[in-house]
Amino acid sequence: MWAKTTAFALILAAAAAAQDDEAKKKDEEAKAKIADFKKELKGAKNEKDISHAIEGLGELQHPRVLAELKGYLGRSAEEAVAAAEQIGKYKKDKDAADMLLGAAGARKDKDGIVKCLRYAGDTEFKGIVTKLTAYFRNKDTDIAKESVDSCAKVKSKDAIEPLLGLWKELDGIKEEKADKGGGLGVGGLGGGITGTGGVGASMQEEQLKRKRDLTPAVQSALNKITGEDFKDLRAANDWWRKNKGTFKDLE
């Protein structure tokens, strides 16, 4: 018995030593990769060259590399997008997902925000759903849509009710025909807008575009998260009322 215990202990010790050696090896690889990256930066003549160097750095996934990439999320749009794309490859990684959501909140340029949201979704880390759904009400339809699309990639049941709520708001935007006075009415997000043109008509078109762009995205996201095929909002709500207590995230 003692001999078996000793042998087992030796096996465990050997396995631990092997893991430690592998970790040290990867750490050295990361240091070398970062050193090569910095050398390449010295020869960079423009943002395109820098972005290319960032892509090369991202070929190796390691905490040291991730920390290096983080520093570029606050740079120019092109550099930030290049870094965000590489960070998005860190699947199920909380730090990577949080970095991208933090960058999305800090940036002022639309493309940078959209891409950070997109690559945050690529991490598939479920802990970011609450932050993603906060973008549903963003006035910019493209930003709102990207947050919906990212929820579809994360596939967390925590996104279902916010998505249903958004669908309800969008469903409330009515595509009404012109009334006798030539005006058009719109409900939902900005309801009660009427008029013969000008600002009212412009706001109406904006809301209708939002509805047309976001509704298919919301429907698709709900289908991917639940594995169902909802044809309309009523069907989705009915299903959720019946399954809310037992539904678990799909693998």
Predicted features by range, described:
Residues 1-7:
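Bacterial N-terminal signal peptides that target proteins for export
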Residues 9-18:
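Hydrophobic h-region of N-terminal signal peptides that target proteins for export
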Residues 18-63, 78, 198:
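N-terminal leader/linker segments that initiate helical-solenoid repeat arrays
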Residues 27-40, 62-74, 81, 92-106, ...:
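Amphipathic alpha-helical scaffolding segments comprising HEAT/armadillo-like alpha-solenoid repeats
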Residues 45-50, 76-81, 108-113, 128, ...:
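Positions within the helices of HEAT/ARM-like alpha-solenoid repeats
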Residues 53, 83, 113-116, 147, ...:
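Conserved hydrophobic register position within alpha-solenoid helical repeats
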Residues 58, 88-89, 118-121, 152, ...:
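Structural signature of alpha-helical solenoid repeat scaffolds
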Residues 150-235, 239-246:
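Extended alpha-helical scaffolding segments
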